[in-house]
C-alpha cells in the first residue's frame, strides 16, 4: 500500500497455469529458428533484396523488421505487472480511462448547460477553456452549478496571467460546496513553456507561479496544476520520438526548476500532467505511451521521491489535429477512431476525441455526440476498458516500445546536455526541428509517400467545399498581446496546401474538365485512367473517364466535344510512341495535353513538344499548382 495515496495494487486476474506435464497444443509442430524463417522469406522474394523489401526504415530513427521473435524483446522489458514500477504496462491495475470532452463557450451559463447535458451521456471528464476576462468570483459557481466535483474530473485551461487567481477561487468554491477535497479530481493546465513556444512570450516568473499553484492545490491531492502540452508538437507534425523526447525534457524542466526553488519533488511530480497527441501510426502510438510511462518513472526516480507513486505519469491523450481534413471530413471519424483505440490499448488515463468537423466550424451537436460515442464504443462494445495492457508480451509491441524509448531518450539527453528544454525553446531549436519534421511529412504527402484519404488520394470527385474554410485558432485570452520575443511553433495541418489548391479552383468560378483519352492496351489504359482521375480530382477538376477509343482521332474529337481543358492520354508504355505525338498535334493549343506515365520514349516525346507527364514519381502538389497556373487559376 502506498503511504501517500493509499493505493494498493493487486493483479485483478488470476491465471490457472497449465501443468507442465499436460499435453501442449500443437506439439506436433517442431520449433522453427529465426534463421529458417528468414531463409523462407528470402526464398519467396525470388532474388529481391531482403533489406530493401522487408525492413521498414522509419522516420523515428530505427528500423522495423518483417517479423519478431522472443529473442527480440530486450531483457526485462514489460516484465512487471500493470500498476508496478516503472509502469510500462500502466499506472493502475485496470484500464478504466476517462472519456473527456472539451468545452469552449463564451459564457459560464452556456458552458454549464453543455457540461450537464454530456455528463448524462457517458462523459466523465470535462475540460473548460477559461479566458482571462472570465476569471471572476461569480464565474466558477455559474460554470459548475449542478456538477458533482467528486464524480467527474474537472480540467481547466486558464489564461497564464490569471491562473493563480483562478486556482484560489476554485479551491474556495469546492470548500464552500462541502466537497470532499481528497476525492476531487482534475487539472489546471499551467504550461508557461507552451505559451513561450506558441506565442513567443517571455514568462521568466513561471517558477514562482508553479510554487503558488502547488501551495494553492495542496488540499487537492488528486489535482494536477502543471501541464506538459506536447500535443502541440504532435499537431505541428512532430515525429513520435520527437514528441516523446521533448515531452520528457519539458516535464523535467518543470521538475528541476521547482525542486531547485524549494518545492518537494513529490509535490512537483504529482502535480504534472502530460497531454500528449495521438498520431495515426497505430502500433507505434501504443508503444509510445508505454515508453512514456517507463521513461518518466525513471526520470522522477532520479530525484529520490519519498513515495514511488510520484513516479507515475498522469497521461491524457488527444487525437491529432495534424491529419484532420476539410474535404471528405467524415473520414476524420475513422482517423480519430483508430487513434483513440491505440491510446485506449496503451492504457492512458483519459482521452479526448476531436470532433470530425473541428477543422472548419465550431463542432456541431452531432459531431460532439459522435466524438463522445467513438470512445463509448471502445469501452462498452469493444470492452477495451476491461483489459489491462493487452499489447503486453507482443514481440512486436515490446520491441517497438524499446526502440521508441531508446530514440526518445537520445533526444532527451541531447536537450539536457545543451541546457534544457526551455533554453532549446528560447533559441528556437525545438520549433525548427518540429518544423523540419512537418515539412518533411508535407513533402511526403505531396509525393504521395504519405496518404490523406480524400485529400491527396481517392478524393470525392463531386465534393465542393460549400463555403467551408479552415478556422483560425488562437489563445484568445487577451493577455500579453505584445509582439513575439522569440521564434514560435508553426502549427499547420498536413493537408492544408492541397485544400488551398482545391478551394482556389472552386473560387475561380470555372471548374476545369480533364478528359481521359483511353486507347490501346485495355488493362494499362484503365489503370492509368483511374490513376489520372484521382490525381487531377485532388485539385477539384471535373474528370471525364472513358471506356476507350478505337483511334486517336475519335478520342480527340470526343475531348473537343466535351470542351475539355485538359486531355490525358492513357495507354501502355509501348504504345505511347505510336499515339502520343499524333494526339498532341491534333489537340494543339485547344487544351493542355498530358501523358499518363513515364514511358521509355519520354525524351522523344519531349523533343516533339510534349512537356506534361504524370506518374507515381512526380510531386503531385507542385504538378497541380503548375496546371492551375496554366489554366489561369
Q: Can you say where each PLM-predicted feature lies in the sequence?
A:
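Catalytic alpha/beta active-site cores
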Residues: 15-281, 312-316, 344, 350, ...
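Mobile "lid/hinge" segments at catalytic clefts and subdomain interfaces of large enzymes
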Residues: 221-258, 334-412
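Intrinsic disorder at enzyme termini
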Residues: 19-35, 53-56, 62-87, 349, ...
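Glycine-rich anion/phosphate-binding loop at the beta-strand->alpha-helix junction
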Residues: 248-251, 275-363, 370-371
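Short glycine/threonine-rich loop-to-helix capping motif typified by GTGT followed
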Residues: 238-244, 279-291, 320-333, 361-371, ...
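A glycine-rich phosphate-binding loop feature that marks nucleotide/adenosyl-phosphate handling sites
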Residues: 55-63, 189-193, 229-235, 269-279, ...
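Short, Lys/Arg-enriched N-terminal segments with co-localized hydrophobic residues
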Residues: 3, 8-17
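Conserved, mostly hydrophobic/aromatic
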Residues: 61, 122, 178, 296, ...
Amino acid at each position: 500500500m502506498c503511504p501517500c495515496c493509499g493505493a494498493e495494487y493487486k493483479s485483478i486476474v488470476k491465471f490457472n497455469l497449465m501443468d507442465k506435464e499436460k499435453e501442449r497444443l500443437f506439439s506436433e509442430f517442431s520449433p522453427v529458428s529465426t534463421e529458417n524463417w528468414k531463409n523462407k522469406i528470402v526464398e519467396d522474394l525470388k532474388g529481391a533484396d531482403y533489406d530493401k523489401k522487408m525492413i521498414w526504415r522509419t522516420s523515428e530513427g530505427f528500423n522495423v523488421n518483417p517479423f519478431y521473435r522472443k529473442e527480440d524483446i530486450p531483457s526485462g522489458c514489460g516484465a512487471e505487472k500493470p500498476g508496478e514500477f516503472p509502469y510500462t504496462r500502466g499506472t493502475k491495475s485496470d484500464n478504466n480511462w476517462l472519456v473527456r470532452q472539451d468545452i469552449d463557450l463564451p459564457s459560464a451559463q452556456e458552458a454549464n448547460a453543455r457540461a450537464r447535458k454530456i455528463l448524462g451521456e457517458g462523459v466523465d471528464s470535462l475540460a473548460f477553456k477559461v479566458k482571462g476576462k472570465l476569471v471572476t468570483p461569480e464565474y466558477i459557481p455559474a460554470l459548475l452549478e449542478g456538477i458533482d466535483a467528486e464524480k467527474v474530473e474537472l480540467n481547466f485551461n486558464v489564461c497564464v496571467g490569471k491562473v493563480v487567481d483562478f486556482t484560489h477561487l476554485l479551491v474556495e468554491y469546492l470548500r464552500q460546496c462541502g466537497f470532499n477535497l481528497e476525492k476531487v479530481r482534475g487539472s489546471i493546465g499551467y504550461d508557461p513553456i507552451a505559451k513561450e513556444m506558441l506565442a513567443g512570450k517571455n514568462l521568466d516568473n513561471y517558477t514562482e507561479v508553479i510554487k503558488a499553484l502547488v501551495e494553492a492545490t495542496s488540499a487537492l491531492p488528486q489535482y494536477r496544476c502543471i501541464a506538459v502540452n506536447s500535443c502541440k508538437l504532435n499537431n505541428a507534425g512532430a515525429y513520435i520520438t520527437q514528441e516523446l523526447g521533448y515531452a520528457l525534457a519539458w516535464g523535467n524542466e518543470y521538475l528541476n526548476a521547482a525542486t531547485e526553488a524549494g518545492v518537494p519533488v513529490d509535490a512537483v511530480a504529482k502535480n504534472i500532467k502530460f497531454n500528449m497527441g495521438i498520431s495515426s501510426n497505430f502500433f507505434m502510438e501504443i508503444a509510445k505511451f508505454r515508453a512514456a510511462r517507463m521513461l518518466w518513472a525513471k526520470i522522477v526516480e532520479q530525484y529520490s521521491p519519498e513515495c514511488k507513486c510520484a513516479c507515475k505519469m498522469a497521461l491524457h491523450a488527444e487525437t491529432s489535429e495534424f491529419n484532420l481534413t476539410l474535404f471528405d471530413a467524415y473520414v476524420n471519424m475513422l482517423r480519430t477512431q483508430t487513434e483513440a483505440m491505440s491510446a485506449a490499448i496503451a492504457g492512458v488515463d483519459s482521452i479526448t476525441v476531436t470532433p470530425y468537423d473541428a477543422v472548419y466550424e465550431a463542432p456541431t451537436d452531432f459531431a460532439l455526440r459522435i466524438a463522445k460515442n467513438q470512445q463509448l464504443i471502445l469501452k462498452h462494445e469493444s470492452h477495451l476498458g476491461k483489459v489491462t495492457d493487452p499489447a503486453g508480451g507482443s514481440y512486436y509491441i515490446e520491441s517497438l516500445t524499446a526502440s521508441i524509448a531508446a530514440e526518445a531518450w537520445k533526444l532527451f539527453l541531447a536537450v539536457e546536455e545543451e541546457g534544457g528544454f526551455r533554453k532549446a525553446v528560447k533559441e528556437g531549436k525545438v520549433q525548427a526541428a518540429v518544423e523540419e519534421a512537418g515539412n518533411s511529412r508535407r513533402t511526403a504527402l505531396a509525393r504521395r509517400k504519405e496518404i490523406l484519404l480524400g485529400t491527396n488520394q481517392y478524393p470525392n470527385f463531386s465534393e465542393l467545399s460549400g463555403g467551408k474554410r479552415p478556422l483560425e485558432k488562437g489563445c484568445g485570452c487577451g493577455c500579453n498581446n505584445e509582439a513575439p520575443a522569440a521564434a514560435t511553433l508553426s502549427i499547420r495541418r498536413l493537408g492544408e496546401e492541397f485544400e488551398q489548391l482545391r478551394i482556389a479552383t472552386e473560387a475561380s468560378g470555372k471548374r476545369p474538365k480533364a478528359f481521359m483519352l483511353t486507347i490501346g492496351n485495355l488493362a494499362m489504359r484503365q489503370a492509368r485512367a483511374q490513376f489520372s482521375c484521382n490525381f487531377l480530382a485532388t485539385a477539384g477538376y471535373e474528370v471525364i473517364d472513358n471506356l476507350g477509343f478505337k483511334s486517336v482521332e475519335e478520342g480527340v474529337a470526343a475531348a473537343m466535344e466535351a470542351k475539355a481543358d485538359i486531355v490525358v492520354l492513357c495507354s501502355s508504355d509501348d504504345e505511347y510512341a505510336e499515339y502520343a505525338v499524333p494526339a498532341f498535334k491534333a489537340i494543339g493549343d485547344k487544351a493542355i495535353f498530358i501523358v499518363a506515365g513515364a514511358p521509355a520514349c519520354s525524351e522523344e516525346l519531349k523533343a516533339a513538344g510534349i512537356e506534361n507527364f504524370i506518374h507515381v514519381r512526380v510531386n503531385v502538389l507542385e504538378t497541380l499548382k503548375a496546371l492551375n497556373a496554366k489554366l489561369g487559376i
